[in-house]
């Protein structure tokens, strides 16, 4: 590149960033692609908003049955723009689920799950399950009446599974009944385990799309 800066030359010599930029900027976009093909990207944006606002709330949230509710109230009433951060987190969560559903329908209706993109579809469905699980675990964290009874009902569902049902219930609750161990496990799942899982499957999803390209029209 003519008249490039020393900083650019330093990175170019080591990482060949121009080749990376050319690869992204010259990627062919099929003529049949329309606005509905942006639904997956919008879902990603919602996830990034979720990550940023969720990270901000961890500075104030206290994952204990005695202080969880009061810490959420403190965030909403006393922290500067805390109400906005939590509201954006909730709104983007709803938007993420909506965009995900529409994205799945778009891919299904346009046949984007067919050979050779079966694994892309599998990773997408896996991410859909993780996203719904985000909603279940996050719903309980304020530890109000709605959150408590939601956890009690959801964690009791596996009891209907033969042989391993009771073990799964105890694994989710951290004991025989819903309590501090349950909240701790749901908090850990919501803020650490699931974000990492989703990030890994997102990377796999994007790499496969990058390799195979966008599916053709029906």
Curated annotation (Swiss-Prot):
Membrane topology annotation: Multi-pass membrane protein
GO molecular function (one): metal ion binding
Cofactor: heme b; heme c
Residues reported in the UniProt entry to bind heme c: 38
GO cellular component entries: plasma membrane-derived thylakoid membrane
Keywords of this entry: Electron transport, Heme, Iron, Membrane, Metal-binding, Photosynthesis, Thylakoid, Transmembrane, Transmembrane helix, Transport
Pfam family, one: Cytochrome_B
Transmembrane segments: 35-55, 93-113, 119-139, 189-209
PANTHER family: CYTOCHROME B
Database matches in NCBIfam families: PRK03735.1
The protein, known as: Cytochrome b6
Organism listed in the record: Synechococcus sp. (strain CC9311)
């Amino acid at each position: 590149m003519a008249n490039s800066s020393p900083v650019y030359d330093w990175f170019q010599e080591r990482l060949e960033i121009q080749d990376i930029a050319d690869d992204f900027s010259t990627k062919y976009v099929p003529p049949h692609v329309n606005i509905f093909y942006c639904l997956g990207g919008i879902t990603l944006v919602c996830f990034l908003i979720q990550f940023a606002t969720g990270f901000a709330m961890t500075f104030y949230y206290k994952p204990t049955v005695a202080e969880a509710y009061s810490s959420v109230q403190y965030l909403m009433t006393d922290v500067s723009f805390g109400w906005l951060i939590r509201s954006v987190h909730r709104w983007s969560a709803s938007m993420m689920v909506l965009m995900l559903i529409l994205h799945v329908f778009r891919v299904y209706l346009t046949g984007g799950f067919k050979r050779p993109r079966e694994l892309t579809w599998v990773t997408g469905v896996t991410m859909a399950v993780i996203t719904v699980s985000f909603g279940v675990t996050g719903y309980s964290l304020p530890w109000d009446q709605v959150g408590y009874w939601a956890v009690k009902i959801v964690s009791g569902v596996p009891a209907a599974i033969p042989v391993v049902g009771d073990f799964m219930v105890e694994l989710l609750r951290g004991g025989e009944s819903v309590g501090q161990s349950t909240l701790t496990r749901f908090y850990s799942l919501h803020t650490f385990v699931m974000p990492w899982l989703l990030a890994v499957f997102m990377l796999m999803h994007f790499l496969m799309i990058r390799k195979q390209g966008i599916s053709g029209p029906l």
